[in-house]
Amino acid sequence: EWGFTPENQIGELRSAALPMSLNRQPHYTNGFVIVGDAGGMVSPFNGEGIAPAMKAGRYAAEAMAQALARTHRAGIDRAMSAYPQRIRDEYGGYYQLGRIFVRLIENPRIMRLCTTYGLPIPRLMTLVHKLLSDGFERQGGDFDDRLITTLSKMVPSA
């Protein structure tokens, strides 16, 4: 029987990298779809992956519904190709921003500047909170939402 025993509670510490920034592709090929962690859909900003996985599942299901209405392989593949494109459109630029953000804050001098001068500014922290949490509205929204959306579109897709 499986369980924690004194013999198996101590062992070598091991870890694995989180699959992030859409680094697992293709998201669709030859009738095979990947979503969530399998598709590298973990956010580089915060390590969160449940919401992107659920959204990807919905997008995949919508593409599959369209594909099921097709009778030929070419039509099925065309319908399914909407899924990876939708994932790239939704997360590609945003995740690329996350990769840039991580590279910046890995630098202790930049991080010190951010904490010294950025943390005391509530308005800036509201923007940063939306950015880090993927809590911005991709269409419409306030100035912060539009700024993050614009930045996400300016960088090359992940």
Where is each model-derived feature located?
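FAD/FMN-dependent oxidoreductases across multiple families
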Residues: 1-64, 69
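C-terminal helical "tail/cap" subdomain of flavin- and related membrane-associated enzymes
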Residues: 65-158
